[in-house]
Structures are given as C-alpha cells and as structure tokens.
C-alpha cells in the first residue's frame, strides 16, 4: 500500500512537472542574431539561393492594395506582390478588442510576411532592390455578398514577357491561391521558376510570460509527415529537401495560428530555409520551366494564413492539420478533441463541453479506477500480516520476498493491481491536456461569470484554489498507512504544489482538472461504500 501511494505521488508530481515544464518552454527560445557571413560559411545555402539577392527587401512600396473577404483582410504590396499584412476578421487581437488579430504584418521592429515571385534566367524577382512594380486595376477589392470567389490580377511587362500574378480568395477560407501566368513574346526561349517563402524576425518571442508557446518553422515531405524546424535550427544550417512527388509544405507556426506555403503539382520542388541577419525564411522553390517564344507557362502555390482549424487545413494539403501538435499521444488527443467539438455543438459552451467530456472520460475509466481502489484496499488489509512478517523475518530480504509472494498468491492479491490502472490512465490525462491546450476554439471563449476566456488564466485564481481544495479533500478521504515522516510531508505538500502550478494555467485546463477531482471524490465515495460491505474498508 505504501509503495502504491508513493508511486501515485511520484507519478502525479512527474506528470505535473513535465506538463508545466513543456508548457513553459515549448516556445522557441529567442535566438541571438547572427551575421550572414557566419551562416554562409558554416554550411552552403541551397543551390537556388544564389539566384536571390542576399539582402532583405529595401525597395520602397509603390502602393498597398487592400483585399477583404468574410474571414481575411490582406494588404498586398504592388512591388513584388508580397502579402505584408493579414488580419483574421473573425479573431480579435485581444479579449473584447475591436481590432482583428494580425497574423502577418510588416511594421517597425516586427516583420512576418509572405513573399512569392519568379526567379531563374528570366526571373523578375532576382534582386530585392529591383522587384517588379505590378499594375492593378483598383486600390481595394472586397468579396461581395453574392460572390464566393474573389480574383485580384496584377500585371507586369519586361523584355518581351508579360507576367500576371493573381490572388484567388474564397468565401470562408483561409487558403489563398497565388498564380503566375507568363506569356513569352520575346523572340527567344525564357526559363524561370516560382518561389514562395515566409519571412519572420528571428528575435520574436513566442506568446507571453503566462502563455509561452512555440514560434518557428515547420515542414512536411513525402517521408516526414510533420517536423518542426526552429529558428535555432535555421541558424545552425540551411534546410534543403526535395519533394520527389511534389507533396509537402513549409510553414511558420505559433500558438493557435499558422502560415504555410503549399506547392501544387510540382514534382522536384525544393523546401528551403535561409537566414539573413535577424530574418529567417522558410519556403519552397518550384522547378524551372522553359517557355518557348509565343508560348505561355503557369505556376501556382497556395498560401494558408489563418487559425489552426484541423478540418479545413486537412482539405488544403496532406498533413497540414498536424501543425496542431498533440505530441506523441496524438492518436488519443485527436479523438478527444473531436468528441469535445461534438459536445460543444450540442451544448453551445466550451466550458460546459469540457465538463461533459471530463465526466465521459472519467466514466469510461471507472472500471480501471474501481480495480485500482479495490487492489489498494486488499493490500491495505494485508498490512498487519506483512508487518508481522517483517518483524519475524528481519533483514533476510530473499526470504521476505518469497513469503510475501506466497501471501499474495494465497490471498489472491496482485501487488501491482493498484498501480497498473493508474499508469494506464495517465496517457489519457496527458492527451486530454494537449487536446485542450492546442484548441484554437477555446481562445477567447467564455464559460460563466468571471471566466471570460478559457484559454487564459483565471484572473482571480478561484478555479486553481478550488482545484487545490479538491485535492486536499481527496487526500483526507483516502486511507493511508504511511508512517514515514518524509512521505507524509510530500503528500501534504502536493495540493499546495499543484495549486501553485495551476495558478497560471489556462482556465479551461484548470476546469478540466477540477471537475476530474470532483468525479474522483464521487467515485471514491461509491467505491468505498461497496468495499465496506465486503469488509475491505473502514471509515
């Protein structure tokens, strides 16, 4: 019994520490800016990098055009046709703020933009100081109520070639198709290819002091479904991977939101990263195409700029939904998230959905919980016999072990019976933690009364204090034979430690743990009453 309680304490402490540590340092640590010469001398850049000007864009903007749909508001620079701002219209910057969340922006001290262009012998984006200045028919474009698709063509002519860059946005979608059409009237062959990358400051920290998260790169290939590539990785070496079948993507991700470039039908495309000063690029370079005189060529890629909505992202590209990172227990967390979403669609409140999900999960695990408490009760009933055995045998460990096993066999008690159910439950608890932690749906979602945002900490710490109190009640209800003073101090300190950890946890997670503790109290009462009737428990 003592060993089981000790294991319980250690498991809870370990899980709490690991979750808290992961939550605190999941973000990419702010890296130090590096000189370009150091980067280039350490590892050679991908072969195509020589085509691009090594300096960040310095050319003054000719004009910014505004593109508005029901879910996005974009600012596109007519110089180069870069997306220099992306506001998510249905997500506020802060709770109760009228300002939309800015995913992409190009401001003093912060740059996160989506660039795309044409490189190669006849490319027009080889130099960041001499990029094409596109012509466009209007300063703003808005998706009308009777429209499902909005197209923004931008044109440019040089050296006998006609270039058209078109942005295509659809109602309700965060996926933006970017197409290049090139008509060759130069009298000679023209060779060029498309590139598309995301550029971001390497010094940007992820999240805030109370909600630090990962901010950095990620990619997918035919061989690697999903892999993070942090800013530190980019500084260590330039990424260069070939998409043999053209299936993959490159992304910059952060908590709840992501931007990604996805090539379309481009076997041989190259995923790459490069670091220039304190700026990091991650993107894709499509193979060159040779366009004969009088002929034309078409290039296309898709830009995702929006929240981490798994269903929509899975439709845009294979494995893009994996940016919702549930960790190694994804196969448990993903069904739990699906079930949570289904419940919310009925009850209409994410906090109530968390409560319902907790009751469902704990109810499903009730047989394991009952087996755990029953085994612990049987072990507790054997304590007098085990103590007498220790006094009789003394320090002969081998004999003590043999007689203990004989006693367990005679009494039909499994000494690990109380530990195994607990160990089996832990992955479910951890998976549910990540399902709640990664759900953008909880962002700015209210519960009741003072809880206005389930993704933020409880402003008055009421839920963490209630959670700590529920842990204290569980301890008081649980029989113990622990006599070691150190173990007693550890067990007494556990509710205090948990309460401290949970003070800064998102209130949705604290709500889950509080409700889980309440369910534990209910289940304990029911199980102990049943054990009393069997003579295995006394008040």
UniProtKB/Swiss-Prot annotation:
One of its GO terms (biological process) is protein transport. It is a multi-pass membrane protein. The chain crosses the membrane at residues 6-26, 341-361, 416-436, 454-474, 495-515. Pfam families: 60KD_IMP, YidC_periplas. It is found in: Cell inner membrane. It comes from the Bacteria. GO terms for molecular function: membrane insertase activity. One of its GO terms (cellular component) is plasma membrane. Interacts with the Sec translocase complex via SecD. Specifically interacts with transmembrane segments of nascent integral membrane proteins during membrane integration. NCBIfam families: PRK01318.1-1, PRK01318.1-3, yidC_nterm, yidC_oxa1_cterm. HAMAP family: YidC_type1. Belongs to the OXA1/ALB3/YidC family. Type 1 subfamily. Required for the insertion and/or proper folding and/or complex formation of integral membrane proteins into the membrane. Involved in integration of membrane proteins that insert both dependently and independently of the Sec translocase complex, as well as at least some lipoproteins. Aids folding of multispanning membrane proteins. This is Membrane protein insertase YidC. It comes from Vibrio vulnificus (strain YJ016).
């Amino acid at each position: 019994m003592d060993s089981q309680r000790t294991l319980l304490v250690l498991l809870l402490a370990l899980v709490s520490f690991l979750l808290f540590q992961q939550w605190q340092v999941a973000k990419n640590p702010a890296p130090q800016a590096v000189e370009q010469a150091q980067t280039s001398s350490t590892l050679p850049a991908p072969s195509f990098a020589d085509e691009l000007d090594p300096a960040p864009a310095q050319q003054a903007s000719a004009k910014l055009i505004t593109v508005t749909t029901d879910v996005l508001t974009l600012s596109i620079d007519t110089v180069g046709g870069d997306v220099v701002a992306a506001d998510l219209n249905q997500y506020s910057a802060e709770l109760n703020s009228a300002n939309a969340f800015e995913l992409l922006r190009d401001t003093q001290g912060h740059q996160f933009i989506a660039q795309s262009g044409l490189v190669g012998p006849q490319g027009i984006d080889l130099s960041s100081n001499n990029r094409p200045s596109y012509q466009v028919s209007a300063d703003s474009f808005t998706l009308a109520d009777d429209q499902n698709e909005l197209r923004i063509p931008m044109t440019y002519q040089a050296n006998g070639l006609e270039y058209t860059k078109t942005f295509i946005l659809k109602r309700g979608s965060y996926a933006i198709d970017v197409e290049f059409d090139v008509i060759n009237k130069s009298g000679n062959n023209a060779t060029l290819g498309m590139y598309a990358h995301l550029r971001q400051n390497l010094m940007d920290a992820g999240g805030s002091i109370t909600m630090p998260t990962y901010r950095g790169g990620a990619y997918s290939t035919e061989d690697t479904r999903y892999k993070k590539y942090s800013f530190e990785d980019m500084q260590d070496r330039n990424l260069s991977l070939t998409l043999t079948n053209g299936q993959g993507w490159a992304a910059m991700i952060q908590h709840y939101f992501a931007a990604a470039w996805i090539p379309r039908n481009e076997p041989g495309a190259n995923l790459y990263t490069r670091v220039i000063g304190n700026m990091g690029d991650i993107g894709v370079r499509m193979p060159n195409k040779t366009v004969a005189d009088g002929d034309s060529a078409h290039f296309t890629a898709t830009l995702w700029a929006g929240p981490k909505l798994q269903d929509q992202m899975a439709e845009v590209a294979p494995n893009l939904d994996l940016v919702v990172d549930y960790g190694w227990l994804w196969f448990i967390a993903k069904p739990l998230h699906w079930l949570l979403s289904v419940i919310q669609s009925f009850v209409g409140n994410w906090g109530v959905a968390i409560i319902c999900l907790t009751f469902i999960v704990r109810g499903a695990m009730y047989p394991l919980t009952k087996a755990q408490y029953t085994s612990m009760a049987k072990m507790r009933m054997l304590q007098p016999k085990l103590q007498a055995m220790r006094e009789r045998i003394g320090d002969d460990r081998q004999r003590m072990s043999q007689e203990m096993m004989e006693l367990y066999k005679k009494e039909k008690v499994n000494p690990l019976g109380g530990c195994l159910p607990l160990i089996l439950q832990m992955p479910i608890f951890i998976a549910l933690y990540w399902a709640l932690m990664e759900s953008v749906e909880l962002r700015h979602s209210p519960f009741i009364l003072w809880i206005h945002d389930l993704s933020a900490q409880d402003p008055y710490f009421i839920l963490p204090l209630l959670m700590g109190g529920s842990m204290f009640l569980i301890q008081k209800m649980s029989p113990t034979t622990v006599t070691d003073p150190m173990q007693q101090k550890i067990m007494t300190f556990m509710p205090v430690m948990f309460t401290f950890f949970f003070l800064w946890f998102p209130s949705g997670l604290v709500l889950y743990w509080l409700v889980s503790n309440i369910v534990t109290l209910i289940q304990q009462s029911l199980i102990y009453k049943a054990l009393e009737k069997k003579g295995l428990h006394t008040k």
